[in-house]
Amino acid sequence: MSKVIGKVSQIIGPVVDVVFNGKDVELPKIYDSLEITKKDGTLLVLEVQSHIGENTVRTISMDSTDGLSRGYEVVGTGNPIKMPIGADVYGRLFNVIGDAIDGLGNLPKDGDNGMSIHRQAPRFEDLSTSSEVLFTGIKVIDLIEPYSKGGKIGLFGGAGVGKTVLIQELINNIAKGHGGLSVFAGVGERTREGNDLLREMLESGIIKYGDDFMHSMENGGWDLSKVDMPGMRESKATFVFGQMNEPPGARARVALSGLSIAEYFRDGAGSDQGKDVLFFVDNIFRFTQAGSEVSALLGRMPSAVGYQPTLATEMGAMQERITSTNKGSITSVQAVYVPADDLTDPAPATTFAHLDATTVLSRKIAELGIYPAVDPLDSTSRILTPQILGDEHYDCAQRVKEILQKYKQLQDIIAILGMEELSEEDKLSVSRARRVQRFLSQPFHVAEQFTGLKGVLVDIKDTIKGFNMIIDGELDHLPEAAFNLKGTIEEAIEAGEKMLAEA
């Protein structure tokens, strides 16, 4: 088939119009990718969004349009954007169009070596539903909003309350213990965090660059010539990045690029059997934000709060692909930025509908110095039922919620009249609730350099035992401070006895 060739007719920021003149020229299809070779030899990829009139298509650019001018030649590829697949993608870093950004050379994407980033969600009869719990070793999550294997998990929070630290801790706890494959999609977040994550994955052995490279890294070097390419196939993770400095086209598509690789791992290809995959996205809000940045330029009328009118459709098309089939499962953890701490904003509100478990991070709790700053009363989980978790776990979670809810209701009275006006029973409830609140905190492995405390993983049995002891009043004699940033209840008791001895 002869290539379709057009010319750039209009450029408005990231949106480029391309005109295809000539008789019987077949316009590129919606979501096809087009390529422009710039004067410096670099390739600019565009994605068709709409057809205007008889011979013009409107496209979004996947990279900066700086230096582009009208009249540039545009070549149609006849395919959507593709990501490389196969055993060689393990341990690699890609951008939105599937080019390697780790300096280790590009992988082929043509024919069977590539997979389109736009795909249909699995059919209804292919879906699998299981209700197995995924324990994370983080007390507040495992007790109050337990995650399910093959489920969708959202971490909601405003700016600076700890979403990325929590997602990094989950990668540390689940990806290392899980032993399966992980895909990390960095969508419109800080490049520094991506770099930190890669170094952390190398140190923990999830990504394997070989011993020679690790020696050079320990000495402060980054010598890519020492990377053991065949050994890299033993890696357990793949990264796809479209960070803050990228144009909106890349940020609006990079989540789909990462998802395509996760789907390939899940479904397998040919002899490859499907696998259980972890899919981390930081941050899913930037996917929506990028869509809203280009929506008006694409000629769409804005809807509520200036978001694109297709917000729910775009989110639904992506979220329905993140699912578990009878071939394999995708367990996804998505960080969701909450603009101005308003959970009713259309972007986080649309995301809520798709999730099995939500972990809401609260600024009020962060201000108390309780980390992770999870709000136990706002967070939810589909599998918090006695049938799945057992009566002991369920009852303990309800008792914790009950005592915290009572404390919340009494806070207005305390603020106006003071603690003295409470009944003895209420005073006791408040003092226990404050201990519970502090015991929900925990030192993280990834935050050791901030806290100076060694990170801990807490078994669910120890978590249940600890909270039951506090609520039953067995530890009323210990000071509140003893419960802050402790793992197990034994650590808290030891710290409390020490404080009492020193007092």
Swiss-Prot record:
EC identifiers of the protein: 7.1.2.2
Gene3D superfamilies, A to Z: 2.40.10.170, Bovine Mitochondrial F1-atpase, Atp Synthase Beta Chain, Chain D, domain 3, P-loop containing nucleotide triphosphate hydrolases
Enzyme class, spelled out: translocase
Cellular localization per UniProt: Cell inner membrane
Keywords, alphabetical: ATP synthesis, ATP-binding, Cell inner membrane, Cell membrane, CF(1), Hydrogen ion transport, Ion transport, Membrane, Nucleotide-binding, Translocase, Transport
Protein topology in the membrane: Peripheral membrane protein
Superkingdom field: Bacteria
SMART domains: AAA (SM00382)
One Gene Ontology MF term: proton-transporting ATP synthase activity, rotational mechanism
InterPro entries (alphabetical): AAA+_ATPase (IPR003593), ATP-synt_VA_C (IPR055190), ATP_synth_F1_bsu (IPR005722), ATPase_a/bsu_AS (IPR020003), ATPase_alpha/beta_chains (IPR050053), ATPase_F1/V1/A1_a/bsu_N (IPR004100), ATPase_F1/V1/A1_a/bsu_N_sf (IPR036121), ATPase_F1/V1/A1_a/bsu_nucl-bd (IPR000194)
Any Gene Ontology CC annotation: plasma membrane
Binding-site list for ATP: 157-164
Catalysed reaction, written as an equation: ATP + H2O + 4 H(+)(in) = ADP + phosphate + 5 H(+)(out)
Stored NCBIfam families: atpD
Family per record: Belongs to the ATPase alpha/beta chains family.
Subunit structure: F-type ATPases have 2 components, CF(1) - the catalytic core - and CF(0) - the membrane proton channel. CF(1) has five subunits: alpha(3), beta(3), gamma(1), delta(1), epsilon(1). CF(0) has three main subunits: a(1), b(2) and c(9-12). The alpha and beta chains form an alternating ring which encloses part of the gamma chain. CF(1) is attached to CF(0) by a central stalk formed by the gamma and epsilon chains, while a peripheral stalk is formed by the delta and b chains.
Stated role: Produces ATP from ADP in the presence of a proton gradient across the membrane. The catalytic sites are hosted primarily by the beta subunits.
HAMAP family: ATP_synth_beta_bact
Protein name (database record): ATP synthase subunit beta
Taxonomy of the source species: Bacteria, Pseudomonadati, Bacteroidota, Flavobacteriia, Flavobacteriales
Gene: atpD
